[in-house]
Amino acid sequence: MKLNIAYPRNGTVKQFEISDEVLRRVQLQDYRLGNEVDGAIFGSEFKGYIFRLRGGSDKDGFPMVPGVLASSRVSLLVKRGAIGFNTFRGYQGERRRKNVRGCVLASDIALVNVTISKVGDQPIEGVTDTTAPRRLGPKRASKIRKLFNLSRTEDVRKYVVRRRVVKSGKKDRLKAPKIQRLITPRVKARRAKKAKDAIAKVRASAAERREYLRLIASNRRALRQRDHSKKHTRKVHAQRAEVAAFQKK
């Protein structure tokens, strides 16, 4: 079995090979993903360490899924974005049947991923005795403010983490990332213009609606007056016909 040990505090990861003799002395079925285990079960060099089980895969590469209480391979109906079904595959709302491993360890697990929760007495070479600094700093404006404890009125462009680019035969230069979600006067003006255009559009639509309703009302009023005039004309003609008939008698 291969064991990937990660130490997020130092940003280091290293893979170790665990022999079958060591695994025979351990009841792997007693552990599942999310549990904290004593590092001594993987060898005497990890004595005193506390590991948290994060993931793994079997010999065929099927990943372990948290929450599936099984020590064997199961077939799950999963949606896009789940373990085993990438987001860029399939259609929106589609579900597929995928084979995954349960969260319980077994003897046929080929790889286990763990993180260090508690450091032991002896350092692990390449994990706890070294530090891998982050190559890139934060890019989003809110995260830069959080890193340097800046207020919303301070300019974050002065605090961007720059890195030095070294190329043979060329002068060294500093490279900085483009700040995302940065609020500048240009952004404020664009948002104000967008809001102003939206308000003007609503007002123009309301004015057109009022004009349309006024036109409809005038047409209906003219139609009622025309109908009333026709009825009055028919009534007058009927009365005149009655008078003429009465006079003939």
Curated annotation (Swiss-Prot):
It comes from Leishmania major. Component of the 40S small ribosomal subunit. Plays an important role in controlling cell growth and proliferation through the selective translation of particular classes of mRNA. GO terms for molecular function: structural constituent of ribosome. Belongs to the eukaryotic ribosomal protein eS6 family. InterPro entries: Ribosomal_eS6, Ribosomal_eS6-like, Ribosomal_eS6_CS. PANTHER family: 40S RIBOSOMAL PROTEIN S6. The gene is RPS6. PROSITE patterns: RIBOSOMAL_S6E (PS00578). One of its GO terms (biological process) is translation. The keyword Ribonucleoprotein applies. Residues 223-238 have a biased composition (Basic residues). It holds the Pfam family Ribosomal_S6e. Residues 223-249 are annotated as: Disordered. This is Small ribosomal subunit protein eS6. GO terms for cellular component: ribonucleoprotein complex; ribosome. The lineage of its organism: Eukaryota, Discoba, Euglenozoa, Kinetoplastea, Metakinetoplastina. The keyword Ribonucleoprotein applies. Keywords: Phosphoprotein, Ribonucleoprotein, Ribosomal protein. Ribosomal protein S6 is the major substrate of protein kinases in eukaryote ribosomes.
